[in-house]
Amino acid sequence: SAIISDTLLFRSPTCTPMDRAAAVSLAEMAGIKLDEFANQMFEAGSELKGKSDAEILYLDFKKFSAGKTNFGVGQINSLNAEELGKLKNRMLPFMEKAREDEGLDMIFFMLTNILTETTELLCVGQGAAQVVADAFHVGDANEELKQTATLPGVVSRKKQLIPALTVTLEQ
């Protein structure tokens, strides 16, 4: 389950050939089908009913610094597009409060759809929308990014999101 979770069932750029081989071997030993097990695991892990905004944001949240900017990034992985869609409007006001409470310049929150390998990135803080527009060449901050951007193919905070944000913030 750790390999499946870390690699998003081999979809993440963090996945290595050794990860895949180990998972296949372990699944054979355990007598399970990887796809079925992964779906059950992701469904259980993305069950957000009854969780507060704080629990959702801080479930997988890390702080970073780049240039003179301190920022935080949270992430939720789900198979359920409807569940992710509902989070968008719910989380933005809380993210602004969390940004102030944490003393951060910006907060980004990745709503990652495992099936479509797409992230809807929410952002708050002065200049955050421009950073996303510049880092991922999406939208035009002059027409207002509206605090969200769709990032096809982006599923990894570590390998995809943080490097792009860091390069942009350090310019």
Feature-to-residue mapping (PLM):
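Active-site histidine-anchored catalytic micro-motif
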Residues: L9-R11
